[in-house]
Regions:
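Conserved alpha/beta-domain cores
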Residues: 92-93, 517-519, 527-876
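Structural motif
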Residues: 237, 407, 424-426, 445, ...
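Nucleotide/phosphate-binding sheet-loop regions of phosphoryl- and nucleotidyl-transfer enzymes
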Residues: 1-388, 411-415, 421-424, 431-436, ...
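Extended, non-globular alpha-helical segments
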Residues: 393-433, 485-523
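Glycine-rich phosphate/ribose-binding loops and adjacent secondary-structure elements
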Residues: 329-331, 431-439, 443-445, 451-458, ...
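Short mixed-charge
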Residues: 70-82, 482-484, 725-734
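Short beta->alpha connector loops at strand-helix junctions that form conserved
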Residues: 40, 447-449, 468-471, 560, ...
Length: 876
């Protein structure tokens, strides 16, 4: 019989695939003798079985839960459902990959009306028991029935107003009894039934709810942006309750073995006296820093500090721990590798190597490539900070800087991003429902919550700035306004700027500056470069882009889109004259005017990137994209060409296409108008010769786009070679150049062995290859892809991560066929996928020579390539 339930003592840290991260770590801590409340884990296999069985728990799984519960009763000396000595449990999710705030938790499960009354009488602490009961009802209603927590928070706020108190902790035992009754009434009103009184029914419903939550909207979204497959499922951890809310000698907290914002080696965290764990991360009360525990409970602090160091030594990584103190006794509820900012991730990795705790390769594997994005983006300029007006301060919860219009709901921020509007998400406190809004924002500002609140943890993981706990700001959700300590009012749509490194909130929009990279980052990236096999190039159309990419470690240009050079006003006019020319003579005259611009641009690129190679893609988009749109532009062009406006309208109409993506573009333009390819070749080769004459090594790689037939490539290549060789011969310079093609039409991948006979390199244009393989338009796919994610048809955006099964198969076929006739064939990719870590790893697996990506993604690709090489060599 398959085992679906494991007691903590039966597992270990290597079983995270079936026990989930939390369950595996609870098992490990139990086995090394740490004070962990007893419990058991329902496996990820049980989760997958739940979905296979039509969202029902099988009798097998239920029977194994009963057996484990009986063993837990025996160990604890308490009985589940007993009136005077009840075993209460927490039910928590725990996926294989850490997903903070993504899944759901229920505490104090096992209470009902009779048990609460008898238990309170026995222990003589009515406030504690009914505080626990009302929390249980609220969590059960939220997780199991989908009843919004905010409805219950409103009831609590009404009681606090009636009593004239500010915090939950100031409510007495009678208030807790009243709250419990009000919560039960609210539950019945919403659910249409009384709150369940049978403890085992409560448990089974909670387990099913956690399994269900694996496929809630926010979990699906989080998985998609973090490349977590839905097939992994989540485990459920059922654990004996320990109570941080049993009095002034109890408490709960969250702490890290190092500072998750800076990486500094020092205990960092927060705790609340007389509270339960969810209070700390929910941000409902602002907690005390962990350092004050040293004076409040010195023995507990000493024990905790010792355990924290033991856990870091054991896991060889910074740990994020949850703990509870019950009547002066410390319990560890969880440990996991802590989420951290990008700068902290790099510092911790470098420090652990210097402390001889891990190797350089282990350090490289420790940092998520996507995190580096946060290190590469702008901060506020010193001048703007000096002149900026600070209107409030909160906690520096996630570093970096962000400016934007303030909005108070995640949905508004998401809509603004679609419109290209920079927004800050402002909330009392964030919840898991805000995840997509946070990811769409330039930063997050919360009124409540501490350094380990949901907002802080998730923002750090996403690499966006966050100021939390700005409690001097008054947020009016109905009027959508913020009132600052000085009395100033900011309305929805007004600009604010937040600095997540200092906690300061500024009026208006502050000026930003480029990030500077040095120190630990350079050390860390040098280790990555030692480990990787793939080269990393950049997609750059200007010398400025090329120089930025060089700063980030680019080793050449993998894609220069020549059409982008035509869009400046004086250039576009001459280019339009070329397009609208009706004779070869007119066209060549227009091209002669364009030639100097192109040559000068290429010289700048060659100089910026020397001595590395530069891949220049010849004209690719359909000609109609360059045509004049307004009547003024049309008349101006007609006058210059000596045509009437009507005649020019006819030319424009003749160039219009029904399906331009598959129309007159790419190599088809060079075949129809060979003079375009000649002009571009002259510009490339003459620029290379001019730069070479200055003593700079130049290697141009000329790339013919949209080839689907070897004869197309041969025709254009012959023009290129004839033109280039004539110029080189007359110059007296020994210049080497290469001619290759983009593989972006499925037919090109299928016939790559033929095409390779005429190509010195292949660059896979994964944007168009994905469009043509799926039959999707990248520009229109957003209209329906969300439905695909919601219905489980797609897990990932195929335009962001290579579809390994379809597009990837074509790439593999193209690579193998190409190298079968030309073993020295250079292989690369130049689509948006070149900066996606999973796609980079796929290219490493296929034996590609390089990937090419936008300048700001170069470090991400360098690290992804290093991780891929290390894991491949380890056989993983």
């Amino acid at each position: 019989m398959e085992k679906y339930v494991y007691l903590f003592q039966e597992g270990n840290k290597d079983m995270r695939n079936i026990l989930g991260g939390k369950g595996a770590n609870l098992a490990e801590m139990t086995n090394i003798g740490l004070p962990v409340p007893s419990g058991f884990t329902v496996t990820t296999d049980a989760c997958n079985k739940y979905y296979e069985d039509g969202k029902e728990l099988s009798s097998e799984v239920i029977d194994q839960i009963k057996e484990a519960l009986a063993k837990l009763e025996a160990k604890s000396g308490k009985k589940f459902g007993d009136k005077t000595n009840p075993l209460l449990v927490s039910v928590r999710s725990g996926a294989r990959a850490s997903m903070p705030g993504m899944m759901d938790t229920v505490l104090n499960l096992g209470l009902n009306d009779e048990i609460a009354e008898s238990f309170a009488e026995k222990i003589g602490n009515k406030r504690f028991v009914y505080d626990s009961y009302r929390r249980f009802i609220q969590m059960f209603a939220d997780v199991v029935k989908g009843y919004a927590k905010s409805k219950f928070e409103t009831i609590i706020d009404e009681i606090k107003v009636k009593k004239g108190v500010k915090n939950d902790i100031d409510l007495d035992e009678n208030d807790m009894v009243e709250l419990t009754n009000l919560f039960k009434s609210a539950y019945k009103e919403f659910a249409g039934e009384d709150f369940p009184q049978e403890p085992f029914t409560q448990l089974i419903e909670a387990v099913k709810a956690v399994f269900r939550s694996w496929n809630n909207e926010r979990a699906i979204y989080y998985r998609r942006i973090n490349d977590i497959p839905s097939s992994w499922g989540t485990a459920v951890n059922v654990q004996e309750m320990v109570y941080g809310n049993s009095g002034e000698n109890s408490g709960t907290g969250v702490a890290f073995t190092r500072n998750p914002a800076t990486g500094e080696k020092a205990l960092f965290g927060e705790y609340l006296i007389n509270a339960q764990g969810e209070d700390v991360v929910a941000g409902i009360r602002t907690p005390s820093p962990i350092a004050t525990l040293k004076t409040e409970m010195p023995k507990v602090y000493e024990e905790f500090a010792s355990i924290a160091q033991e856990l870091e030594n054991h896991y060889k990584d910074m740990q994020d721990m949850e703990f509870t103190i019950e009547d002066g006794k410390l319990f560890i509820l969880q440990t996991r590798n802590g989420k951290r900012t990008a700068s902290a991730a790099v510092k911790v990795a470098v420090d652990l190597v210097n402390e001889e705790m891990i190797t350089k390769e282990e350090a490289v594997l420790m940092v998520d490539p996507k995190q580096l994005d946060a290190l590469l983006h702008p901060t506020f300029t010193a001048e703007s900070i000096k002149n900026g007006k600070v209107v409030a301060e909160g906690l520096a919860a996630s570093p970096g800087a962000g400016s934007g219009k303030i909005y108070f709901t995640a949905s508004d921020v998401i809509e603004n991003k679609k419109k290209g509007i920079d927004s800050l998400l402002v909330r009392l406190e964030t919840s898991p429902e805000d995840i997509e809004g946070m990811n769409s924002s330039k930063g997050v500002l919360t009124i409540r919550g501490g350094m380990t609140s949901h907002a802080a943890v998730v923002a750090r993981g996403m690499g966006i700035c966050c100021v939390s706990g700005a409690s001097t700001i008054v947020l009016n959700e109905e009027e959508k306004t913020l009132k600052m300590p000085d009395g100033s009012i900011f309305k929805e749509g007004d600009y604010l700027s937040i600095d997540g490194s200092t906690g300061k909130v500024y009026a208006g929009k502050l000026e930003m500056q480029e990030a500077s990279i040095s120190g630990d980052f350079e050390t860390f990236m040098s280790w990555a470069d030692e480990a990787r096999d793939l080269k990393v190039r950049t997609n750059a159309d200007t010398p400025k882009d090329a120089m930025q990419a060089r700063k980030f470690g680019a080793e050449g240009i993998g894609l220069c889109r020549t059409e982008h050079m035509f869009f400046e006003r004086d250039r576009i006019f001459n280019f339009r004259k070329m397009i609208c020319a009706t004779t070869l003579e007119e066209r060549e005259k227009a091209l002669e005017n364009i030639l100097p611009y192109q040559r000068k641009d290429f010289e700048g690129l060659f100089e910026a990137m020397a001595p590395f190679s530069v891949v220049i893609r010849y004209l690719d988009p359909p000609l109609h994209e360059f045509l004049p749109k307004t009547e003024t532009e049309i008349k101006e062009l007609a006058d210059d060409l000596g045509k009437t406006v009507e005649e020019l309208h006819e030319v424009i109409a003749s160039l219009k296409e029904f399906n331009p993506m598959m129309g007159h573009r790419g190599c088809r333009l060079a075949i129809t108008y060979p003079e375009i390819a000649k002009m571009q070749t002259r510009a490339v080769i003459e620029a290379a010769i001019n730069v070479t004459k200055k003593g700079t090594l130049v290697t141009p790689e000329i790339m013919i786009p949209l080839v689907g037939e070897v004869k197309e490539l041969k025709y254009v290549k012959d023009i290129v070679v004839k033109t280039a060789d004539e110029i080189i011969a007359s110059s007296g310079i020994d210049l080497k150049y290469e001619v290759g093609t983009m593989i972006e039409i499925p037919r090109a991948a299928l016939l790559a062995d033929q095409i390779a006979t005429e190509a010195e390199f292949f660059s896979f244009g994964t944007n168009d290859l994905t469009q043509m393989t799926y039959g999707f338009s990248r520009d229109d796919a957003g209209k329906f892809l969300n439905s695909y994610y919601e219905k489980g048809i797609f897990e990932f955006d195929p335009f962001a991560r290579i579809d390994f099964d379809g597009v990837g198969l074509l790439m593999e076929m193209g690579a193998k066929k190409g190298r079968s006739v030309n073993p020295k064939l250079s292989l690369g990719i130049c689509g948006e996928h070149g900066g996606d870590p999973a796609s980079v790893a796929f290219c490493d697996k296929l034996g590609f020579n390089y990937v090419s990506c936008s300048p700001y993604r170069v470090p991400i690709a360098r690290l992804a390539a290093a991780r891929a090489a290390i894991l491949r060599k380890q056989g993983k």
